[in-house]
Amino acid sequence: NCLIFITIILRKEAKGMSKVNHPFWVIVHKEISDHVKSWRFLILIGIIALTCMGSLYTALTNIGAAIKPDDPDSSFLFLKLFTASDGTLPSFVLFINFLGPLLGIALGFDAVNSEQNKGTLSRMLSQPIHRDCIINAKFVAALIVIGIMLFVLGFLVMGFGLIAIGIPPTAEEFWRIVFFIITSIFYVAFWLNLAILFSLRFRQAATSALASVAVWLFFSVFYTMIVNLVAKGLSPSQMASPYQIISYQKFILGLMRLAPSELF
C-alpha cells in the first residue's frame, strides 16, 4: 500500500511538472517577462496611469455637480468616479475607450514579425512546438498583462475614491465595476488580436503597426462620419409613419454597433 501511495504521488508530481514545463506556458512566462521589462510597456502604463488619475481628480472635484435630485442613478454614488467629468478631461470610461485600443495594438503589433526578423522564430519552430501554440501563447501573455494592469488601475481608482469621499461602494456597485473591467479586457483583447493578425500578415513591424492604427482611426473617427452621412441621406420625411421611423433608427443603430467603440 505504501508503494502504491508513493507511486500515485510521484505520478501527480510528474503531471504537475509536465504542466509547468509545457512549451505553451514556457512561452507565456517568457512573453510576460519581456512585456514587463520593456520600456514600451512602462511608458504605456505611465501614460494610462496618469490619465486615469487625472480623470479621477476631475470626477472628485465635480462629483457634487454630477449628483442630481431627479437622477435615478444618484444612488450609485461610487460609480460616478468612473463616469463623472466637467468637460476639461474625459472620464475614466472614455479614457479606457480611447487608450485601450492603443494598449492592445502596442503589445501585439510586433508579436510575430519581430521574432521573424530577429531569426528566433525559426529556432522556436524547429523545436516540437506547434505554430498555433506560439501565437496563442503570445496572445495569452499579453492578455494577462493587460488584465492585471486594468484591474490594478480600476482598484486604485476605487481605493483613492474611497479615501476621498469616505463612502464605501455597495456590493452592486463593486460587481458593476468588476464586470466593467472584465468587459474592458475583452475590448482591448479585440485590438490585441487584430494587431497580432497584422503581425502575422506583414513582415515589417512598422507596417503592422500602421495597419492596426489605421483600422482604429477608421472606426474611431471616420466610421462615425460615414454613418452620419448615411443617416442624413436616408432620413425619413416628416410624413413617414412611426414604423418607418423606428426601422430607420434600428438600421442606424445597427450600423453604429459595427464599431467596437460603440459596442464598448
Regions found by a protein language model. Give the residues of each.
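Aromatic- and glycine-rich beta-strand/loop motifs that create alpha-glucan
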Residues: M17-A49
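A structural motif at transmembrane helix-loop-helix junctions in multipass membrane proteins
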Residues: S38, I182-Y223, N228
